[in-house]
């Protein structure tokens, strides 16, 4: 938001930090000219980003009203699933630009996808678009500590996270629902399972996801399919070289690599969980909603060193 040429920050709402400087909470913003946190809302803004905890966005919108012209982008999971997308007169669109760019460009209310969901959907959608998901899909994905949010917990403490590795919510992660719905949107007859194993890594930012499933064509056919599917996607790139996290951290990119072993296709998908998996994608969606250049404010270089 700070460096987006078409945006002017009107307010940052917080009841717990009202009156405090933003840099008091977000120390990386020290020295920036910013308003203080406020408990007062301006109901006439052009766009509102909701960054509340899961389950709180719906309550917030039920208790606050905004101008008919206000566009709302919600970063929680409150409106991501089809059964949850209507609240009163508001109907939310699922905001994966590589899947729903046309619908996003016409929407006023948007549900920003989850971070794991973004990485995994981008890995699978090209296959689904041609009806080529014919078997179960196995996914193993590792996320950094920032995937757990800012609240302190045992598994985000440095002494626990450092030199450590673990899985959590095996086969039951909350992002499975939106992943399955997105895949079924482009391949309606798909009725197999996604076996998703999420892992906690000992790094701060990024998601490294690998998925494999049956694929009878050769590797070149797979590359041509993926390159064609993402030909016009400004942030999703198919690499013929192996990819790694440092290529995407601090960017809105998703990098994809393919590998074939016997009758299995391995798809590697890497993103920054805080940008393409959250706030960066929210800005990308806002650009689409307002008819702006999709890359505006998002041409960022990776933190490689």
Residue ranges and their predicted role:
Residues 1-162, 166-170, 189, 257-261, ...:
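N-terminal Rossmann-like NAD(P) cofactor-binding subdomain of oxidoreductases
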Residues 9, 135-139, 191-194, 235-239, ...:
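A short coil-to-beta-strand element that immediately follows conserved catalytic motifs
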Residues 91, 115-122, 170-178, 221, ...:
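Conserved active-site and cofactor/substrate-binding residues in soluble primary-metabolism enzymes
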Residues 107-110, 165, 206-210, 266:
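Short, solvent-exposed beta-strand edge segments and adjacent coil->beta transition regions
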Residues 167-171, 199, 244-248:
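Short Gly/Pro-enriched turn/cap motifs at secondary-structure boundaries
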Residues 172-238:
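C-terminal substrate-binding/catalytic lobe of Rossmann-fold NAD(P)-dependent dehydrogenases
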Residues 209-305:
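C-terminal active-site/capping subdomain that shapes the small-molecule cofactor and substrate pocket
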């Amino acid at each position: 938001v700070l460096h987006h040429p078409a945006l002017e920050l009107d307010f940052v709402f917080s009841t717990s930090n009202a009156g405090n400087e933003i840099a008091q909470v977000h120390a990386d913003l020290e020295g920036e000219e910013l308003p203080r946190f406020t408990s007062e809302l301006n109901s006439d803004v052009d766009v509102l980003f909701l960054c509340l905890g899961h389950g709180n966005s719906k309550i917030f919108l039920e208790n606050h009203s905004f101008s008919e012209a206000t566009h709302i982008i919600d970063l929680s999971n409150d409106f991501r699933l089809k059964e949850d997308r209507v609240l009163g007169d508001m109907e939310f669109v699922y905001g994966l630009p590589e899947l729903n760019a046309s619908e996003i460009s016409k929407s006023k209310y948007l549900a920003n996808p989850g971070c794991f969901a973004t990485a995994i959907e981008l890995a699978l959608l090209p296959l689904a678009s041609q009806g080529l998901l014919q078997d179960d899909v196995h996914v193993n994905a590792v996320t950094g500590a920032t995937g757990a949010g800012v609240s302190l917990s045992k598994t985000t403490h440095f002494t626990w996270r450092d030199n450590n590795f673990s899985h959590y919510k095996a086969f039951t992660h909350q992002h499975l629902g939106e992943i399955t719905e997105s895949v079924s949107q482009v391949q309606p007859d798909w009725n197999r399972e996604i076996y998703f194993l999420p892992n906690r890594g000992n790094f701060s930012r990024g998601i490294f996801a690998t998925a494999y499933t049956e694929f009878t064509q050769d590797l070149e056919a797979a590359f041509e399919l993926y390159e064609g599917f993402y030909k016009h996607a400004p942030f999703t790139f198919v690499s013929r070289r192996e990819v790694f996290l440092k290529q995407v951290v601090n960017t809105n990119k998703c990098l994809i690599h393919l590998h074939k072993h016997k009758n299995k296709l391995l798809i590697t998908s890497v993103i920054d969980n805080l940008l393409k998996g959250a706030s960066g994608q929210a800005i990308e969606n806002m650009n689409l909603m307002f008819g702006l250049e999709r890359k505006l404010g998002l041409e960022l270089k990776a933190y490689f060193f």
